[in-house]
Each structure stands twice: as structure tokens, then as C-alpha cells.
């Protein structure tokens, strides 16, 4: 087994968030940062902007991987997929505005390597974002399930139809306080549902200079995204989820005045309005490894790997972990194959001699098996 060293973790399709505790590899904490994009650029937001604490909302929604429970009778009970650890464990989730520029292109590319022009970020570069975050926690709701006692819930979220005043409506469009008569506006599969700081988004999105909202290049330079920071809660087993953050969105519902001038005259209306942001653009997944006794023992095993005769135990770990090398044909390379491909001759050719011999004899391998036993 050999260490991988830091690994590139930007712009992955699926990312990790949470804490995972393993009896062999120790504790891994996964954080995440992403850019945001306006769904509709250069929006008409209006004037006299308000976000009413009751009537309006600013929320973040990111769906989890899930499937319907076929054994349930209600038809809308879900089972979460890609969740590791104790699903009932809580985490201390903090969401901040990112202040670090997530570049598309590397400032120092190698002209001989086309791939070097794309910016690469690695799992151990959390400090870049941590030291540049805007130190105002955005998920500051009084509901601790959205911050200090966050957990990956399998519950659906249901949004009900409301009027301009945020009151529920029944099937006739009349105001109702009866929870049985209210009408469903939208159903959301299980996901991260976080109410964000309304005042902050009013001041920094709705009241931003129009030049910052005119296109997504300007917007991503102005508002550099969200940083999801994870902290462990004492006494918890830990839980980690795989998420497709690109399916997430921020929904801002507010009220404002918009003035329209026609040939008939000028009218100003104050109405409920909406603005949406997608969690799209550049991303980085950060991993931290707790330097405890378990982790140190794992590192010692890697330090003492025997590259000559091999090891009885092999350690395979993703992220900044370890890989396993299997040497099938030995390291001897004192011979090569003649021009006709019929005999071995003196001189190395960067191919193991045993493999050269198999090739010149034309032997075929019909079946080969490698059997690994996993230690519990």
C-alpha cells in the first residue's frame, strides 16, 4: 500500500459533506464550497424592497439521493441513499459566504501540458476558503435542526399555497387556518432545507448594484459562493452524505414596487416576487483527517510497507488515502525480445522478463483470479 498524497477535488459531480468515523482509517471531516449562479440574469428587482419575516422567505434546498420505500403504505415515505455512519447523528453545520475566488484557469499553466490550463484545487486546501470567508453565519435560524443539530432527514418538505400576506389558501382560493384544507403548492423530496438570513440576502443580493447582477461572470466575482463548514457534536457517532450540490437552489421571495409606464400612464405595484440562484459553477470538496491513535496506526502501516515481498494487510482508502500495487511479473528486466518476436536477447526493455517470455511463447491466460479477504 502507498499513500496517494493530496488529491484533486474540484468540480466533482458528487461531493461529500459530514463526518465519517472508521475503526481502521480514523475520522474524516468533509467540507464544501460552491459558486452560485443567477437563474435569470439582469433581473428586474424593483424598489422599496422588503422581506417580511412571516410572508416572505429565503431558503436553501439541496435534494438527497433517495428512493421510495416500497413497503410503506402512504406512497411518500423515502429511504436515503449514499449516507454513511449513524443516520441519526447530528452535525454542527455552518454556512458562510465564500470570499475566495474560485478560478476557472490556472495563473501558471505549463505551455507543454494542455490540462494544466484548468485550475486544480486539492482536498487539503481548506485554508484558502477558511481564511477568506465572510464571517457571518447565514443559517442562523432558531431551529437548531438547521445548524447546531443538523442531520440528514428522510422527511419530505411540503410547501403550501399562500396569498400575498403569507396566509394558507384552500381549494377555492379562500384563506384558511385549517391544516386539512390547505392546498399543496409544491412537494420536495428529502433534502437539506435551510432558512437563510433574510436581511443579509436583501442587502447583498436584492439591493446589490445592478452591474453585479447583469451576468453570471459579474455575479460570481461579486458573490463568490457558499461555504459549508462542518463541526463535530460531542458524543455523536458521525454521519456523512454524498450529495449532488448542482441540483440545489436558493429561493428568495420578497415584495417590491415595480413601475410600468405605457401610453395610458404610469402605474406602480407592490407585489410578491421571486428570485432564484442555482448552486452551480466551480466547487471544491475539502477533507480533514483527525490525527488520533487510529489514524497514526494506519500511517505507521503505510510507512512500514514491504515493497520487496509485499504485505499481509493491504490498505485501500479514497481521498487523500492509499492505493494498492500488485506486481504480477516481478522486477527482473535483463532481457528483451528480438526483432522477429521469437526469442529473448540480452538487454532491458522496461518490460518484466516473465512477461516477455509469455509473449514470445504465445501463451494465453484463460482465467486469472485475485482473492482478497476483508478484515472486519
Annotated model-derived regions:
Residues 1-376:
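Secreted, disulfide-rich extracellular signaling modules
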Amino acid at each position: 500500500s502507498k499513500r496517494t498524497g493530496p488529491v484533486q477535488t474540484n468540480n466533482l459531480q458528487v461531493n461529500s459533506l459530514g463526518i465519517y468515523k472508521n475503526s481502521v482509517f480514523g475520522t474524516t471531516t468533509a467540507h464544501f464550497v460552491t459558486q452560485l449562479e443567477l437563474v435569470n440574469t439582469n433581473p428586474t428587482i424593483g424598489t422599496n424592497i422588503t422581506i417580511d419575516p412571516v410572508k416572505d422567505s429565503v431558503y436553501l434546498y439541496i435534494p438527497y439521493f433517495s428512493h421510495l420505500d416500497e413497503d410503506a403504505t402512504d406512497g411518500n415515505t423515502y429511504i436515503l441513499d449514499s449516507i454513511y455512519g449513524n443516520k441519526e447523528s447530528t452535525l454542527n453545520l455552518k454556512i458562510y459566504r465564500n470570499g475566495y475566488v474560485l478560478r476557472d484557469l490556472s495563473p501558471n499553466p505549463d505551455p507543454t501540458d494542455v490540462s494544466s490550463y484548468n485550475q486544480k484545487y486539492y482536498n487539503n486546501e481548506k485554508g484558502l476558503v477558511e481564511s477568506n470567508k465572510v464571517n457571518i453565519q447565514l443559517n442562523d435560524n432558531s431551529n437548531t435542526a438547521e445548524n447546531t443539530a443538523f442531520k440528514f432527514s428522510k422527511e419530505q418538505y411540503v410547501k403550501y399555497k399562500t396569498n400575498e400576506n403569507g396566509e394558507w389558501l384552500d381549494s377555492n382560493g379562500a384563506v384558511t387556518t385549517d391544516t386539512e384544507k390547505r392546498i399543496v403548492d409544491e412537494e420536495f423530496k428529502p433534502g437539506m432545507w435551510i432558512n437563510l438570513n433574510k436581511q443579509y440576502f436583501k442587502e447583498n443580493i436584492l439591493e446589490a448594484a445592478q452591474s453585479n447582477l447583469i451576468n453570471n461572470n459579474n455575479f460570481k466575482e461579486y458573490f463568490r459562493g457558499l461555504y459549508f463548514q462542518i463541526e463535530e457534536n460531542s458524543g455523536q457517532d458521525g454521519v456523512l452524505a454524498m450529495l449532488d450540490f448542482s441540483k440545489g437552489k436558493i429561493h428568495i421571495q420578497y415584495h417590491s414596487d415595480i413601475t410600468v409606464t405605457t401610453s395610458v400612464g404610469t402605474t406602480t405595484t407592490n407585489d410578491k416576487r421571486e428570485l432564484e440562484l442555482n448552486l452551480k459553477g466551480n466547487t471544491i470538496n475539502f477533507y480533514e483527517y483527525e490525527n488520533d491513535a487510529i489514524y497514526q496506526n494506519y500511517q505507521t502501516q503505510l510507512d512500514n510497507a514491504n515493497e520487496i515481498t509485499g504485505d499481509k494487510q493491504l490498505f485501500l482508502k479514497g481521498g487523500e488515502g492509499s492505493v494498492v500495487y500488485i506486481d504480477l511479473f516481478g522486477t527482473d528486466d535483463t532481457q528483451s525480445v528480438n526483432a522477429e518476436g521469437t526469442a529473448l536477447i540480452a538487454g532491458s526493455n522496461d518490460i518484466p522478463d516473465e512477461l516477455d517470455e509469455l509473449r514470445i511463447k504465445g501463451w494465453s491466460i484463460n482465467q486469472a483470479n485475485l482473492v482478497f479477504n476483508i478484515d472486519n
